[in-house]
């Protein structure tokens, strides 16, 4: 296969993960015109091609070197890795960064009216799942024998349909489980999205572009986790007020016009500033407190 000079990134073609992946690239300054029916999109301002595919195809495309990067849920990534390893294949890739979206958990659930005293209750149970290898690894670690019922969709209906005693499926809010008369009893895996790279070495130009994207992603994620705080503080209360601000290193102190008793403080806080903290700041003597979102950060 001829090596493309453009960086190829695989991402999910539809759904929430697709939307969040698109938003991340946009925040990183990648201009892409994504049309609903097009499976390949081209960046307007960078040598980047976006391949929009099924999520469970993304790990294989990266493992096999068809694409350079992939944005994928860790649950899908590790399930495919375990599948290939079980078939005797060697899996090589680089996990570049965990991303701050796509969070979910892979859990075992049973009918709500059944008692549950621990994982040993599932001995010899038939468990329906779309993640047989992650489930098998967990149950082996727990020393519990079970039977697998592999399904590719609608896993939550398996107990009612008489196909299984329990299920192992992705859970976000738990509403789907409740709607199907199930309750969560074991969390076996916690997942977020991640950025992965093929193992084969990239050209210097491509690697430089990957490094640039990584720097921008780091800046986007740091900005999302940070707030820019401005306030007025009495000079004698600076130390007390600074101690109340979470994650602050070196505040910028500026004089105030026409008031020598106070200064202006500008700080970047690496943690969320809650109402309780703002009330504590006010009680300590701070005034004119502003908390602003940060769009981008670098350095």
Curated annotation (Swiss-Prot):
**What does its activity-regulation comment describe?**
Feedback inhibited by histidine.
Write out the GO cellular component annotations. cytoplasm
Entry-linked InterPro entries: ATP-PRT_HisG_long (IPR020621), ATP_PRibTrfase_cat (IPR013820), ATP_PRibTrfase_CS (IPR018198), ATP_PRibTrfase_HisG (IPR001348), HisG_C (IPR013115), N-reg_PII-like_a/b (IPR011322), N-reg_PII/ATP_PRibTrfase_C (IPR015867)
What UniProt keywords are attached to this protein's entry?
Amino-acid biosynthesis, ATP-binding, Cytoplasm, Glycosyltransferase, Histidine biosynthesis, Magnesium, Metal-binding, Nucleotide-binding, Transferase
Principal location: cytoplasm
> One biological process GO term for this chain?
L-histidine biosynthetic process
- Which molecular function GO terms apply here? ATP binding; ATP phosphoribosyltransferase activity; magnesium ion binding
Give the enzyme class: transferase
Catalytic activity reads: 1-(5-phospho-beta-D-ribosyl)-ATP + diphosphate = 5-phospho-alpha-D-ribose 1-diphosphate + ATP
EC assignment: the record states 2.4.2.17
User: Which Pfam families does the UniProt record give?
Assistant: HisG, HisG_C
Pathway-wise, it operates in:
Amino-acid biosynthesis; L-histidine biosynthesis; L-histidine from 5-phospho-alpha-D-ribose 1-diphosphate: step 1/9
The protein's matches in PROSITE patterns, at most eight in alphabetical order, are given as:
ATP_P_PHORIBOSYLTR
Kindly give the CDD domains that the UniProt entry links to this protein: PBP2_HisGL2 (cd13592)
Q: Which cofactor does it need?
A: Mg(2+)
Cited Gene3D superfamilies: 3.30.70.120, Periplasmic binding protein-like II
Q: Which compartments is it annotated to reside in?
A: Cytoplasm
**Which NCBIfam families does this chain map to?**
hisG, HisG_C-term
Provide the family line: Belongs to the ATP phosphoribosyltransferase family. Long subfamily.
Question: What's its job?
Answer: Catalyzes the condensation of ATP and 5-phosphoribose 1-diphosphate to form N'-(5'-phosphoribosyl)-ATP (PR-ATP). Has a crucial role in the pathway because the rate of histidine biosynthesis seems to be controlled primarily by regulation of HisG enzymatic activity.
Q: What is the protein name stated in its UniProt record?
A: ATP phosphoribosyltransferase
């Amino acid at each position: 296969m001829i090596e493309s000079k453009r960086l190829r990134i695989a991402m999910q073609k539809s759904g929430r993960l697709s939307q969040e992946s698109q938003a991340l690239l946009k925040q990183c300054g990648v201009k892409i015109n994504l049309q609903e029916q097009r499976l390949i999109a081209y960046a307007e301002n960078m040598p980047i091609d976006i391949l929009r595919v099924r999520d469970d195809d993304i790990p294989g495309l990266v493992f096999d070197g068809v694409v350079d990067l992939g944005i994928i849920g860790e649950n899908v990534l590790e399930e495919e890795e375990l599948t290939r390893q079980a078939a005797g294949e060697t899996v090589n890739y680089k996990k570049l960064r965990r991303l701050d979206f796509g969070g979910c958990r892979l859990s075992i659930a049973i009918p709500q009216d059944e008692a549950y005293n621990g994982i040993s209750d599932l001995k010899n149970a038939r468990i329906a799942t779309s993640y047989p290898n992650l489930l098998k690894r967990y149950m082996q670690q727990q020393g519990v024998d079970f039977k697998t019922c592999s399904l590719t969709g609608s896993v939550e209906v398996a107990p009612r349909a008489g196909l299984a005693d329990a299920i192992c499926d992705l859970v976000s809010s738990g509403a789907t489980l409740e709607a199907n008369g199930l309750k969560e009893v074991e969390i076996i895996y916690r997942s977020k999205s991640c950025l992965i790279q093929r193992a084969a070495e990239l050209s210097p130009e491509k690697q430089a572009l990957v490094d640039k994207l990584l720097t921008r992603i780091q800046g986007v994620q740091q900005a999302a986790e940070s707030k820019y705080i401005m306030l007025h503080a009495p000079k004698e209360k600076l130390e007390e007020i600074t101690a109340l601000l979470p994650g602050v290193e070196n505040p910028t102190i500026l004089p105030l016009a026409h008031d020598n008793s106070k200064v202006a403080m500008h700080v970047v806080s690496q943690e969320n500033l809650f109402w309780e903290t703002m009330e504590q700041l006010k009680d300590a003597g701070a005034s004119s407190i502003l908390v602003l979102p940060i769009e981008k950060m670098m350095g």
